[in-house]
């Protein structure tokens, strides 16, 4: 049996001024689903990075579109961000991108390329497909229980 979900689809021009619309839409959807504030903030950064990457690299001189699909499941939100622009070799880039190396001076940090590392760090799962253009599928699971239910209550009174 196929898992039930609801789908929201959007298309925006691949311009920086429209990225905020996607970020706000995602935050509203995630809030309705019951995501924690910190998880929503993480997803806002991840979706901004994915869209900004398209704006900066996908279409060169042409103005294209960014397609966004939100898959709302009972336990997770899947976000697909896609373009039909210029693709790149993700596996090659992934080998070059990684966590900050504390032994290197800050002047040697790359100015770009950390977007995919950030997305990978902030989301629970990420898949990237590239053919004609690029598709990034990001998944974040809802963390409903933040505290163990059978723990002992904390008292504010001192015992003597």
UniProtKB/Swiss-Prot annotation:
TM stretches of this protein: none
UniProt GO BP: negative regulation of DNA-templated transcription
InterPro entries xref list: Anti-sigma-factor_SerPK, HATPase_C_sf, RsbW
GO molecular function, one term: protein serine kinase activity
Enzyme kind, highest EC tier: transferase
One Pfam family in the UniProt entry: HATPase_c_2
Reactions it catalyzes: L-seryl-[protein] + ATP = O-phospho-L-seryl-[protein] + ADP + H(+); L-threonyl-[protein] + ATP = O-phospho-L-threonyl-[protein] + ADP + H(+)
Keywords tagged on the record: ATP-binding, Kinase, Nucleotide-binding, Serine/threonine-protein kinase, Transferase
PANTHER family documented for this protein: ANTI-SIGMA-F FACTOR RSBW-RELATED, SERINE-PROTEIN KINASE RSBW
Function (record text): Negative regulator of sigma-B activity. Phosphorylates and inactivates its specific antagonist protein, RsbV. Upon phosphorylation of RsbV, RsbW is released and binds to sigma-B, thereby blocking its ability to form an RNA polymerase holoenzyme (E-sigma-B).
Protein name: Serine-protein kinase RsbW
EC number: 2.7.11.1
Membership in a protein family: Belongs to the anti-sigma-factor family.
